[in-house]
Amino acid sequence: MEFVTGGTGLVGRYLVAELLAGGREVRLLCRPQSDRKALLRFLDHRGLDDQRVEWCEGDLLDGSFMEEAIAGCSRVYHLAAVVSFHPKDAQHMMRVNRDATRILVNAMLHVGVEELVHLSSVAALGRVTGEPVHEEVPFESGPNVTAYAHSKFESELEVWRGQEEGLKVLTLNPTVILGAGDFNRSSSALFAMVYKGLKWHPTGSNGFVAAHDVARACHVLGDQKCWGKRYLLNAENRSYQSVFDQMADDFKVPRPSRPVKPWMMGAVWRLS
């Protein structure tokens, strides 16, 4: 039995499908408001038997519950996180992304579940001007570092603390993840905004990776026992304009034509 948090999310649904296709049994943490039907439709579309999915309803921030939830599992895939660039969500992100990871790590240590695959973010990696982003650049705070980046970096600290206390861990740091999902959540919201006629696009470029590739990496790297490692996941670097143009062309809607600086897009998205 393998335990998954965030299993109804963008990457989580692909990971659950990946595990089931590999013959695994999955215990899936969900909140009362989680959209179970969307995941079940996703699995059914791929011809996968959801009878090997055990639903576990509860709260990541409840330590006693988490100890009971993960008991008897051989590995934990921790994908649950809040992604937001709105200042009002900063405290909530820190609670879910950092504090819940601490609680999960403590629960694993207490009940003896040793293996943890943690989905982090490229945002938790450092930057050196003029150099490509890579796993060895230390994170540094600064005026342009988002609350989301801080929360993901601090969640990683909890994971590495778990390693020092006896867990086998690895982290994956994907770039912008794209895939089929809820258009109201996470990076999937980009598709919804373009479809609805978004007029702006960021200048510059970023790395992009498919959700199914991230899920596959979680599964394969865990099975290959790549413990103690950190992996940057990226498929290709593209300009924002080219990605938004491709979305618009596929939807057969006008392309976003007004360039704005990437740091301004948070305001644009909140107004759209």
Where on the chain are the PLM-derived regions?
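Conserved catalytic-site region of short-chain dehydrogenase/reductase
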Residues: 85, 122-131, 177-182
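Glycine-rich "substrate-gating" loop/helix at the edge of Rossmann-like oxidoreductase active sites
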Residues: 144-147, 175-183, 200-212
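Mid/C-terminal beta-alpha module of Rossmann-like enzyme folds, strongest
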Residues: 217-272
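NAD(P)H-binding glycine-rich loop region in Rossmannoid oxidoreductase-like domains
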Residues: 47-99
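Conserved Rossmann-fold NAD(P)-dependent oxidoreductase catalytic core, especially the SDR/UDP-sugar
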Residues: 90-91, 95-148, 170
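Conserved beta-loop-beta element that borders a ligand/cofactor-binding pocket
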Residues: 120, 157-180
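N-terminal Rossmann NAD(P)H-binding glycine-rich loop of SDR-like oxidoreductase domains
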Residues: 2-22
